[in-house]
């Protein structure tokens, strides 16, 4: 994307045109996410939770900026090593410490703290939250965001915090409850 390529504008009105939801419900959903920093959308499979979550993020960002939205899907084998960091085998033998998708996205959001970033987790109920988030589980709460609540990571003793400009949208199927 060059400096001359403008991203498509995406507003609350665009969201209402694209997603089958009442204006009052959109306002409530948007306000709740901005205040709490975390929400879970639930519904039957195939109703458009992923579509809605991405568009909710774009409507808050104000444009369809895919660089500020990360999407992953949990499963029963998803782990802290995939999500935050862990040792992975190298092709030439041995192991190396690799940072996970959540760690990298948090760092990206921290380096651009005046913008909002959205981390969308599909099938959030299929993963073991304690196993995946580890010591970061507390840090996703709104009251524990930011540098003043940083903690030391298990694998490398690095201090880490979940940035205040990161919003998490989890999704789950009601059939899985």
Where would I find each of the regions flagged by the language model?
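Extracellular interaction modules
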Residues: 1-5
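AAA+ P-loop NTPase catalytic core and its hallmark functional loops
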Residues: 6-177
């Amino acid at each position: 994307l060059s400096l001359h390529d403008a991203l498509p504008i995406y507003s609350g009105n665009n969201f209402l045109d694209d997603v089958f939801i009442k204006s009052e419900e959109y306002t409530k959903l948007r306000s709740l996410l901005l205040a709490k920093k975390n929400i879970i959308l639930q519904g039957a499979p195939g109703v458009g939770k992923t579509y809605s979550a991405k568009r909710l993020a774009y409507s808050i960002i104000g444009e369809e900026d895919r660089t500020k939205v990360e999407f992953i899907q949990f499963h029963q084998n998803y782990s802290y090593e995939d999500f935050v960091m862990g040792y992975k085998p190298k092709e030439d033998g041995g192991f190396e410490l690799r940072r996970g998708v959540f760690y990298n996205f948090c760092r990206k959001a921290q380096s651009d703290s005046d913008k909002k970033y959205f981390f969308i987790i599909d099938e959030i109920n299929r993963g073991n939250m304690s196993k995946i988030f580890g010591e970061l589980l507390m840090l996703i709460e709104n009251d524990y965001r930011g540098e003043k609540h940083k903690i030391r990571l298990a694998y490398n003793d690095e201090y880490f915090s979940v940035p205040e400009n990161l919003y998490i949208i989890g999704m789950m199927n009601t059939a899985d409850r």
